[in-house]
């Protein structure tokens, strides 16, 4: 919860509300988002709870498609001068929004308009830093931050003769387990992954402490040259390409589609966002959680935040900004953060919520649920593991996905795919400067 600033205007308003009898119409605040399944249910639940907690403002959640589609819808709406009050933007879109000076109002400023003061010391450091300017100004509100983890099917492990209580820790162990699962018939597919860009390149770089690009992956300057064709990347993606030849690895799609390959029982292991937990639980599968795999001699270092944050456009009314500030304050309440964390798998963005969850013995009762937090907070970030910030990261991800798909389709090997991705990605980054 934010610190309330008591000002003359606030006190005057409070007195007016106390003595006045006029009925005020609710101010509706559209919240455009890209959440599906269990996470969409959580968006609706939190919106309803906020709406019932007061009578001045009404949050209206609107699903606008997947993450990239939601970002594009928000940009188009702003250009047509009809922006939503709140836009959920995925991690890759942060650079796009940060570059749009004048188009957005920093979350810290929105809070001040509502009479609140943002205190970054109340938040998990890695998360608040990711969505802030170098001077510490918070630009967006970290609603659903996540960390990639390994989910595995305990029943499939048991059938394949693997220890159901010991998930593989390194990538070679994952690949060997996947082969054994496929060969034994325990599952038709051994391993799959959502988000090959976010998990297998951006977080791969951070977790294994290797550069994604120059200039600290874009955090130290916008003139970035990609470095994702170095030997460790080539080794990793060639191993995945080899597993794809006989279906030991199965590709589900560019975003979160592969999650269904796991929840259906088709694939026995899945690397996916911690925020995918809700759908995994709903599937009823006998699952376990392991940390994100790494390569010996390189990792583990620290993961970088995924998920999304809430951005606010310029040009809204003062009343809208006050309502948004109230909603952000509501989302920051410890009980709300604990609920969001425990039900969805997303990280508790406040330290108070994290401490409250630990005190309740939740992590002891739910093994693996603290893993994504420990991955992010375990070590001080290096220049390779602070994050990735490109003004056109969604476009660069599309380029990488095209090359990965050609590789997985048997049209090129990993080195060719990564060399092509670097060449095309660098050209796109240069053109966006």
Curated annotation (Swiss-Prot):
The keyword NADP does not apply. It is found in: Periplasm. Disulfide bonds: none annotated. Residues 1-25 form the signal peptide. Keywords: Periplasm, Signal, Transport. The keyword Transport applies. GO terms for cellular component: periplasmic space. It comes from the Bacteria. InterPro entries: Bact_solute-bd_prot1, SBP. The complex is composed of two ATP-binding proteins (UgpC), two transmembrane proteins (UgpA and UgpE) and a solute-binding protein (UgpB). This is sn-glycerol-3-phosphate-binding periplasmic protein UgpB. It comes from Brucella abortus (strain 2308). The gene is ugpB.
